[in-house]
């Protein structure tokens, strides 16, 4: 049992797992911020531009069921904003990574075949002298 706890601790404290946990927490908080932005700022402005439309009240009643397509539209706007923000973040991150990974100058590999030919020619000359 103790060995399993030690293995779990080692697994949980690996860099990738901790990075993922932090990313999930930050992502959840960012999602709440974007939802608030969409619900409280963007959609009311869009509603005013569309003639006083309140997206939170857009719905269709079918029998006893209520289909709230206004809330669905707000969720789509949420998704688009979050996806765009993630796209920009990844783009910036990859540009930093490319700058960090500057190409290492490769030392030219000596032309081994040329050296072998020179050695062969020198050996032939030495044999002629003997």
Swiss-Prot record:
Q: How does it sit in the membrane?
A: Multi-pass membrane protein
Subcellular location(s) of the protein: Cell membrane
Q: What are the UniProt keywords, alphabetically?
A: Cell membrane, Ion channel, Ion transport, Membrane, Transmembrane, Transmembrane helix, Transport
The superkingdom of the source organism is Bacteria
Chief place where the protein resides: membrane
Q: Which GO terms describe its cellular component?
A: plasma membrane
Stored PROSITE patterns: MSCL (PS01327)
- Sorted alphabetically, which Pfam families does this protein's record hold? MscL (PF01741)
Q: Which residues cross the membrane?
A: 11-31, 70-90
Q: How does it assemble?
A: Homopentamer.
Protein family according to the UniProt entry: Belongs to the MscL family.
The task this protein performs is described as:
Channel that opens in response to stretch forces in the membrane lipid bilayer. May participate in the regulation of osmotic pressure changes within the cell.
Protein name stated in the entry: Large-conductance mechanosensitive channel
Q: Which organism is it from?
A: Listeria welshimeri serovar 6b (strain ATCC 35897 / DSM 20650 / CCUG 15529 / CIP 8149 / NCTC 11857 / SLCC 5334 / V8)
Question: Lineage of the native species?
Answer: Bacteria, Bacillati, Bacillota, Bacilli, Bacillales
